[in-house]
Amino acid sequence: RHNLSLNRSVAERADMEIILAFKAYALWKTFPIFREYISSTTASSLSEAKLAYHEFGSKAHTFSPAYTDYEIDEIAQCSSHLTFNSLTQYERYHERVRRANSDIRLGLRVNPEYSEVGTLLYNPCAPGTRFGVSADKLPQTLPSDIEGFHCHCHCESGADVFERTLAHIEEKFSPWFPQLKWINFGGGHLMTRKDYDVEHLINIIKGFHQRYPHLKIIMEPGSAFGWQTGPLVTQVVDVVEDKGIRTAIINASFTCHMPDCLEMPYMPAVRNAETLEVDDPTKAPEGAHIYRIGGNSCLSGDFMGFWKFDHELQIGENVIFEDMLHYTTVKTNTFNGITHPSIGIVHLDGKLETLRDFSYEDYRSRSEEHTSELQSPIHLVCRLLLEK
């Protein structure tokens, strides 16, 4: 609730709308709490748009790199705003979208060709990006039903980064601002991090309002809502050693349950342990009680390390990874059929409620046949191959 309160306060003081990005957090059983503080969400797929409409109770602000013939109508019906990634996608679908939802607000994603995100995997403005329209490719007069621009350039960034990025956005795209009604500055604004300068962000937005008073401002953070609110509690199931490297194997998996750790990569904080930076991951640092932590999948690279503990790890004791709520539950996979950790919530009175337990049926149902009138070409190809 602290994160929700801060996001609502920033939105009110800066006179903008802050909405939740489902790509980072989509635990719908907690939506009643969220609805006390925010009124909208952002989606990037049909499933997320339906979750917004049916579970959050409001239509989504939707963006996708590429909409499809077999989903676009239902996406439009579940969306209040729909942003196209390219002018070709706009030309292909804008009339169809309006037929499906006459009240929808349309936008274009633009590429300011500037981002300070250092990891290429997460940099939406890197050379060759598939995201957005650059200024040199925009027509001088926008299509009459385009009401807004969407820019996404950040990843767990500070207000100072947004200030510098905004200068590039204005330099490249302000000539089109008089034709717009709203602008969405995307996600990656980590307002709830301790060192985030909230006052500076508010002043930046107020200055933008003074320059462009007709534009409604939207931000759609994800991590800022779930930041430091959910640890992953695992247990040590074995300790093995090879070539001087001790590995504590846990009953969870980096590749299945914490994929961002391997993708970025980054070392998650472990409670009551010191994270050790090493130049050569094949050699253990010197000292006592130093461990790699290994996952319980068959992937050779399902490990990270090293961490230094203040004692010998014992089979059965907890290893707790901090800040594991965002970009985990939405990205878990069933590689190896590894069971997912249960999901729970601690209420204000201290009571722990289990929101979700996972079982064999969750794994099995991924390959279970479902009859549906709407089938994607992927489904049809798979069925044809099986029938042959």
Model segments located where?
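A non-catalytic, amphipathic alpha-helix used as a structural packing/dimerization or gating element
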Residues: 2-6, 168
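A short, Lys/Arg-enriched amphipathic alpha-helix followed by its capping loop at the start of a domain
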Residues: 6-16
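Active-site-proximal beta-alpha core segment in soluble small-molecule metabolic enzymes
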Residues: 16-182, 196, 204-207, 211
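Short, conserved beta-turn/loop elements at beta-strand boundaries and strand-helix junctions
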Residues: 112, 241-242, 377
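Feature marks short, surface-exposed loop/turn motifs that line or immediately flank catalytic pockets
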Residues: 114-116, 155, 191, 225, ...
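Glycine-rich beta-strand-to-loop/alpha-helix junction loops that act as flexible
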Residues: 152-154, 183-192, 221-224
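Charged (often Lys/Glu-rich) extended helix/loop segments that serve as interaction or gating elements
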Residues: 204, 219-368, 372
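Single conserved hydrophobic/aromatic residue that forms the stacking wall/gate
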Residues: 369-388
